[in-house]
Amino acid sequence: MVLDNVSLIMMAAGDSTRFCASNAQTFRCKKQWLRVGEEPLWLVATRNLTHHFSFKQVILTASSKDYVYMQNISPYKVVQGGQTRCQSLRNALKYVDTPLVLVSDVARWDSSDSIIKTMLKALDESVACVVPFVGVADTSFYEGEYLKRESIKLIQTPQLSRVEDLQEALKDTSKDFSDESSALYALGKKIAFVQGSELMNKLTFSSDLKAHITRLSPPSKRVFIGNGIDVHQFEKNKQMWLGGVEIESPFGFKAHSDGDVVLHALSDAILGAIGGGDIGEWFPDTDETYKNADSKMMLSEIYTFAQSVGYELYNADISIIAQTPKIAPYKSAMRECIARILRVPNAHINIKATTTEGLGFVGREEGVCVEACVSMGFINWHTYIKDLH
């Protein structure tokens, strides 16, 4: 169905705070990045709509952390969101050039095409917004009195709004609203309601996955390989760090950060596996913020991001090529440190060391080279369902 007067905005800029907090030991992946086969949930949700409707524009919002990464994956336009849903919507509306807009949360991934068709029919000239709703089955009590449950509506998305009215409703940036209908209602605009569906209930807490598991395929078992290499020359009178461990040495490494060549190579390998660029893009040496930065922090930030977008580490294999210092006395401590940062068993981290038999810059004891290789895969959220309460 062609909708050349309607744009689609998919809200995907949230941090999944409630979702991750509801099972913090298990879920470090944001809900919009849960994989369904090969695709993240935000892409599944968007394609569920674009499969049935041809919108003039399709726009997704992404958090500042995810923005560049999502751009590299998305076949649709991606705009950077704000700190709140309202701010993200304001940013997206700047790019809309149609009179109508359909706004949906990617956490409501299973939108009904028949309900949307009903919404389109319900949008007459007097209506600024059409929303789907479901009722409540339980007796409801609020602030000292029982409510008439037949009058209670639980509002869902997607919501169909007139762009001009919605922009006016969101003009005051000091006000925050949880959805489009509440913003338009506060402006005195007329809202129309159509019957929604329990299938469009929002995925908010990790326990909600139980209701979705039969309709969402498990993640692909594909393995992703990443390689990283880094070299640093020695610098006298500087502390030496390798693999997160302080090394007894008369010199350290010449670098903008602390120069931990092991953690730098490992960070690049992780970024390579997930298609996340390189460590120089994340922590540029032109930024004084990272002057003498702790490479353990850098690795932790990169891996936390990798988990947040749906990946987990299977194993890491690290080769340290050095004439000096001697690596053997520190290998065990390095493994423990790296495993702790990456939240994996020590057995998943392997560290090897070799010399160049006196050849090259390493043999001349001018510096150290490290190569790292990692294997990673999608977090299999299906296996965690049994642990949910």
From Swiss-Prot:
Describe its function: Bifunctional enzyme that catalyzes the formation of 4-diphosphocytidyl-2-C-methyl-D-erythritol from CTP and 2-C-methyl-D-erythritol 4-phosphate (MEP) (IspD), and catalyzes the conversion of 4-diphosphocytidyl-2-C-methyl-D-erythritol 2-phosphate (CDP-ME2P) to 2-C-methyl-D-erythritol 2,4-cyclodiphosphate (ME-CPP) with a corresponding release of cytidine 5-monophosphate (CMP) (IspF).
| Stored CDD domains | CDP-ME_synthetase (cd02516), MECDP_synthase (cd00554)
> What SUPFAM superfamilies does this protein map onto?
IpsF-like (SSF69765), Nucleotide-diphospho-sugar transferases (SSF53448)
Lyase: present as a keyword of the record? yes
Under Pfam families, the record lists: IspD, YgbB
Which pathway is this protein engaged in? Isoprenoid biosynthesis; isopentenyl diphosphate biosynthesis via DXP pathway; isopentenyl diphosphate from 1-deoxy-D-xylulose 5-phosphate: step 2/6; Isoprenoid biosynthesis; isopentenyl diphosphate biosynthesis via DXP pathway; isopentenyl diphosphate from 1-deoxy-D-xylulose 5-phosphate: step 4/6
Residues annotated as region 2-C-methyl-D-erythritol 2,4-cyclodiphosphate synthase? 224-389
Cofactor(s) essential for the protein = a divalent metal cation
Q: Which PROSITE patterns match?
A: ISPD, ISPF
The record, for InterPro entries, names: IspD/F, IspD/TarI, ISPD_synthase_CS, MECDP_synthase, MECDP_synthase_CS, MECDP_synthase_sf, Nucleotide-diphossugar_trans
What Enzyme Commission number(s) does the record list for this chain?
Answer: 2.7.7.60, 4.6.1.12
Site entry (Transition state stabilizer), positions: R18, K31, H256, T355
This chain's source organism reads: Helicobacter hepaticus (strain ATCC 51449 / 3B1)
Q: Where is this region: 2-C-methyl-D-erythritol 4-phosphate cytidylyltransferase?
A: 1-223
Molecular functions (GO terms)? 2-C-methyl-D-erythritol 2,4-cyclodiphosphate synthase activity; 2-C-methyl-D-erythritol 4-phosphate cytidylyltransferase activity; metal ion binding
**Keywords carried by this UniProt record:** Isoprene biosynthesis, Lyase, Metal-binding, Multifunctional enzyme, Nucleotidyltransferase, Transferase
Its recorded name reads Bifunctional enzyme IspD/IspF
| One of the GO BP terms on file | terpenoid biosynthetic process
Q: Where is 4-CDP-2-C-methyl-D-erythritol 2-phosphate annotated to bind?
A: 230-232, 256-257, 278-280, 283-287, 354-357, 361, 364
Listed binding positions for a divalent metal cation are D230, H232, H264
Record's keyword annotation contains Nucleotide-binding: no
Transmembrane residue ranges: none
Give the family from UniProt.
In the N-terminal section; belongs to the IspD/TarI cytidylyltransferase family. IspD subfamily.
UniProt site (Positions MEP for the nucleophilic attack): R149, K202
> In terms of domain of life, where is this protein from?
Bacteria
